[in-house]
């Protein structure tokens, strides 16, 4: 019993567990914030062709709105779609397998680095994908302060034919 209690109370300093993939809720035993998130998710365009890539940026609205942890996914309805690219020198982020390799991004252990105010990743739409996609991110500011599945504006995926 004490081992399971210890395991359940861990703060996932090495990234979100795959058990968080669907509901995007961190296992912090605290309630998510009820006020709107002080973060925005932006893309340079509102439409992209299937098979193409788009940069997705998550930013705090002020310098105090930093991120200690994230879980980022692209969703079409409830389905996680597409794949992500994390820069090789990124000391904050890593890919997560939420049913498919590289279809989510999470934080990694970063004890010696600072929390981030802005992060960007490249997302690639699958070649067969069509319709609207929404980027959703769970953002952890600290153990007790987090927002779950903050949505972006929809991005339209156009047929590559």
UniProtKB/Swiss-Prot annotation:
Gene3D superfamilies: Reeler domain (2.60.40.4060). Its main location: secreted. The keyword Acetylation does not apply. Residues 1-11 form the signal peptide. Disulfide bonds join 21-98. Keywords: Antibiotic, Antimicrobial, Disulfide bond, Glycoprotein, Immunity, Innate immunity, Secreted, Signal. GO terms for cellular component: extracellular region; membrane. GO terms for biological process: defense response to bacterium; defense response to protozoan; innate immune response. It holds the Pfam family Reeler. It is found in: Secreted. It comes from the Eukaryota. Coiled coil: none annotated. Glycans are attached at residue 91. Residues 12-161 form the Reelin domain. Belongs to the insect defense protein family. May have antimicrobial activity. This is Putative defense protein 2. It comes from Antheraea mylitta.
């Amino acid at each position: 019993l004490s081992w399971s209690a210890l395991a359940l109370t861990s703060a996932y300093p090495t990234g979100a567990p795959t058990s968080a993939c669907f509901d995007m809720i961190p296992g912090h035993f605290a309630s998510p914030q009820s006020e709107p998130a002080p973060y925005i998710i932006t893309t340079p365009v509102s439409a992209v062709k299937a098979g193409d890539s788009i940069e997705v940026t998550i930013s705090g609205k002020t310098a105090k709105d930093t991120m200690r942890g994230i879980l980022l996914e692209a969703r079409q309805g409830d389905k996680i779609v597409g794949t992500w690219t994390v820069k090789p020198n990124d000391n904050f982020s890593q890919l997560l397998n939420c049913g498919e390799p590289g279809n989510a991004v999470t934080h990694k252990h970063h004890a010696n680095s600072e929390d981030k105010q802005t992060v960007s990743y490249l997302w690639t739409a699958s070649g067969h994908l069509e319709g609207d996609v929404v980027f959703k991110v769970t953002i952890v500011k600290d153990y007790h302060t987090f927002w779950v599945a903050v949505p972006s504006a929809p991005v339209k995926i156009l047929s590559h034919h």
